[in-house]
Design a protein with these regions (language model features):
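N-terminal targeting leaders
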Residues: 1-221
Length: 221
């Protein structure tokens, strides 16, 4: 018989994972609250990258259904930079990133927050642009407003996603249903872990022309 994971057990496991994660400098500064499998993180961290690391660590704990990341980024004095310096570094980082249409992406910086705008053909290009700037010193957050242009018909998108799900060793494809509306993909069905749910979403995003994925897959633990 499977052991029932209570919210108290889940909170302890998340706290233990945060303490174990080397990318988190001060785990004691992070508050963890759990209700019905939903984890809320509060408190502060020293960088945007650390904020994302904490979120990923919490999501990786068995039994976690979702994470609300309310962590505040408080930059130490040594990491504080002007918006002009951040913009210069961000522009250079984008210049060095392979596979993205650099001339189609614009950026702005306000109080340490980097905003990305423009158009790309593939979702991975949108992600790559964000990955290029989010770890830069002084960055408090990234607002990714880059749009993915639809490139193929919805029937082709659905077919490609169905085939990709079947190829994935991590998933039971027969448990997942794919619906397409224009360039939007809706995923339904059941999986046994958050990682499987995220993997199905990742697969869907790989299809050309996808601009939105609504992941309604239910995690059954």
């Amino acid at each position: 018989m499977a052991t029932v994971m209570t919210d108290i057990d889940l909170r302890r496991n998340v706290e233990a994972e945060l303490n174990w994660e080397p990318g988190i400098k001060s785990p004691a500064a992070i508050g963890v609250r759990v209700k019905d499998g939903i984890v809320t993180l509060s408190g502060y961290v020293e960088s945007y990258a650390e904020k994302l690391t904490a979120e990923r660590a919490a999501l990786g704990v068995a039994g976690v259904k979702a994470v609300v990341n309310n962590l505040e980024v408080r930059l130490p004095t040594s990491s504080q930079r002007t918006d002009e310096d951040i913009a210069r570094s961000a522009a250079q980082a984008l210049d060095w990133t392979a596979g993205i249409p650099r001339d189609q992406i614009k950026l702005s910086v306000n109080d340490g927050w980097v905003t990305l705008k423009g158009n790309v053909e593939w979702y991975f290009q949108k992600v790559a642009a964000e990955d290029a700037v989010r770890h830069l010193t002084g960055v408090k957050g990234v607002i990714n407003q880059i749009e993915v242009r639809p490139a193929v018909s919805k029937d082709v998108v659905k077919s490609k996603i169905d085939e990709a799900l079947k190829r994935s060793a991590e998933l039971e494809a027969q448990r997942i249903q794919v619906e397409t509306t224009g360039s939007k993909v809706i995923l339904r069905g059941t999986v046994h872990s958050w990682w499987q749910k995220k993997e199905a979403e990742r697969v869907a995003w790989q299809a050309p022309g996808v601009t939105q994925v609504e992941n309604q897959i239910e995690v059954i633990t």
